[in-house]
Structures are given as structure tokens and as C-alpha cells.
Regions:
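Bacterial N-terminal signal peptides
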Residues: 37-47
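Conserved HGGG/HGGXW glycine-rich cap/lid loop of the alpha/beta-hydrolase fold
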Residues: 77, 81-132
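Flexible "cap/lid" loop of the alpha/beta hydrolase fold
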Residues: 191-220
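Bacterial Sec-dependent N-terminal signal peptides
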Residues: 19, 45-65
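Conserved serine/cysteine hydrolase catalytic core
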Residues: 218-286
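Active-site loop/oxyanion-hole signature of alpha/beta-hydrolase fold enzymes
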Residues: 124-163
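Conserved hydrolase catalytic core segment
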Residues: 160-197
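Catalytic active-site module of serine/aspartate enzymes centered on a nucleophile-bearing elbow/loop
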Residues: 290-315
Length: 315
């Protein structure tokens, strides 16, 4: 189940930006109560829209089959398309999102058009506690999430190098993967990725978020357990060395709104600029047309830049 995958995209984006607003502690009590109610309301709307509530929708959107990946303590559900390409493009979703957060049409068959557009094998999956993946009650920190990504990649890559594409919190996961497995990585794409130089949380914030998610999704849901680790996650990623020297593209939203003024967006941009340390082929693309979910509002922008990375790689 996703964090805020409501049919009304503007509501989803507004919710997400509120979650990642670093000064929420300044909100008055009545505003906090309002946010809690809205999160639960939008979560219910999300559940309905993401599972296609009507019979007509179910008939129109036949579910794309997945493959289970055994990571020892639980199983994850992965979705792939094979074209026997030299490289494998792997998508890592953000906090609170399952693999469908990459589907701008909302149809599971979109994985086929993504693969066709990239002319490449592609792999998407759901972390524990999302979609059809199993639950895991262990600490869901970045190191654990990266370890599970390694298992998923190993099952599908068959020795090939991968192009990693990470959205939001997924950016932290692919960073850790690339640094720990430089020999397996051919390229990187960061889509409005989280970064420790921007994202800062107090324990009170984490408690508020966790209680909301526990109420909406359950204490063992992926979003709830990942939330508990956010403070430690950003402390951990602050200790990571530079990324491997592979082609890297960062795509960043510079769209302003009531919660994100120009100064805030500049800090967001600057945090992604730090990814270029030690990288000789670095491109930073900005957009004011999309909010946090660039892959949904401007899917072609994201796919074109993934394709650009793939085109640079040795044949």
C-alpha cells in the first residue's frame, strides 16, 4: 500500500511535500491535528484508487505477473521484463510507495512500455510491507533495505551491470548500493532524491509520522517501520564516501508552493549537487513543472534521461 497514491495527484504531491518539510515542528497544534486527519483520509482514498475499486477498472487493468524473491526472513515481489539487454535498469521507489509509483498511467502493464521505451530489461519490486511483498519486523534501515536490493538484483541481473534509478528515499538506497557494489553499477539516476543535507527530523516529528502510519497501515507496514529509522538513516548516509565514477543524472523539482519557497528549493537543489563529488560525468536537471513525483507528472523527462544514461554505456 502506498503512502499517498491518491487519484488526485495534486493532493498526493502536497501530502508528500508536507512529510518532507523540515520545519513542521513550528506548526500549531490545530494544524498538526488537521494534517493527521488528512493523512488518514488520503490514505483511504489511496487504497481505493490503487486497487481499482470498480469491477470495470479491474477488467481494464489486468495485473502484470510478479516473481517472488526470497530474502531469508521474508519474500519480496518483483516485476521484470526481459529483452536480453546488456544492462538491467532497476527502479527503487520512495518512502511509502510500492513499485506502481513509477506508472504514470496507473496500469500495471506500463512496465512493458517502459521497457520498450528504454529498449532494455527493467526490474521493479516492492520492499517489505508494500504491495504483495511480505512483512519484516526487523529494523528497516538503509543498510537493511540495501541488502535486500542486492538480493533482488542478484536474482535478475545474471552477472550484468545495472542502472539504478531511485526516487525520494530510494535515492539513499541506491547510493548505498552503488558505494558497496561499485563493480555492479553502470549508471545512476536520482529522481528528486532525499539527502541528508536537506532532510532533518526531530524525534517528535518521527513519532507523529509513525503514529499516523501505524493507524492507517499497521505497525508492521513498510512505511511505519521505515519511518522509525529516518533519523538514523540520514546520520548513516552522511558518513558514506563518494559515489563510484559512473554516469550520473540527478533530476530535481524546483517547483515552489506554500511550503517550499525559493530559498527552500535552493537548499533542495544544493543537496543534490553534492552527489557529483568524484563523478566526472554528472548532469543536474531541474524542473518547475512537477512536484516531488516527477516520474508521474513528467514521465518522459525521467525516461529520456534514463535512456541517455543507457546510451552512454559500452555496447
Amino acid at each position: 500500500m502506498m503512502l499517498i497514491f491518491a487519484s488526485n495527484l495534486s493532493l498526493k504531491l502536497k501530502n508528500t511535500t508536507m512529510i518532507f518539510k523540515k520545519e513542521i515542528q513550528k506548526l500549531k497544534l490545530n494544524q498538526i491535528i488537521t494534517i493527521r486527519l488528512l493523512l488518514i483520509l488520503f490514505a483511504f482514498t489511496s487504497a481505493c484508487s490503487s486497487i481499482s475499486c470498480s469491477d470495470d477498472d479491474k477488467n481494464k487493468n489486468t495485473e502484470y505477473p510478479g516473481t517472488t524473491v526470497d530474502v531469508g526472513t521474508h519474500k519480496l515481489m518483483a516485476y521484470s521484463v526481459s529483452k536480453q539487454s546488456k544492462y538491467l535498469v532497476v527502479f527503487e521507489s520512495g518512502h511509502g510507495n510500492d513499485h506502481t509509483s513509477w506508472y504514470s498511467t496507473g496500469k500495471s502493464s506500463e512496465i512493458l512500455s517502459i521497457s520498450d521505451y528504454l529498449d532494455s530489461d527493467v526490474l521493479l519490486y516492492d520492499r517489505a510491507g508494500y504491495g504483495k511483498s511480505g512483512l519484516n519486523t526487523e529494523s528497516r534501515d538503509i543498510k537493511k533495505l540495501r541488502s535486500e536490493l542486492e538480493t533482488v538484483v542478484n536474482q535478475f541481473a545474471n552477472g550484468r551491470k545495472v542502472v539504478l534509478v531511485g526516487h525520494s528515499l530510494g535515492g539513499l538506497i541506491i547510493r548505498d548500493f552503488a558505494i558497496k557494489n561499485p563493480e555492479k553499477v553502470a549508471g545512476l539516476v536520482f529522481v528528486d532524491a532525499s539527502h541528508e543535507k536537506y532532510n532533518h527530523y526531530s524525534q517528535d516529528q518521527i513519532n507523529l509520522f509513525y503514529n499516523n502510519y501505524k493507524t492507517a497501515y499497521g505497525s508492521n507496514s513498510g512505511i511505519a517501520l521505515e519511518t522509525l529509522q529516518l533519523i538514523e538513516d540520514f546520520k548513516y548516509t552522511a558518513t558514506l564516501p563518494n559515489l563510484p565514477d559512473v554516469p550520473l543524472i540527478a533530476i530535481t523539482s524546483m517547483k515552489t508552493d506554500a511550503e517550499h519557497n525559493l530559498a527552500d528549493r535552493q537548499l533542495w537543489y544544493d543537496s543534490k549537487e553534492s552527489l557529483k563529488a568524484g563523478v566526472t560525468d554528472f548532469t543536474h536537471i531541474t524542473t518547475t513543472k512537477s512536484g516531488h513525483f516527477i516520474q508521474l507528472e513528467e514521465p518522459k523527462l525521467v525516461l529520456d534521461n534514463i535512456r541517455k544514461i543507457v546510451s552512454k554505456l559500452p555496447i
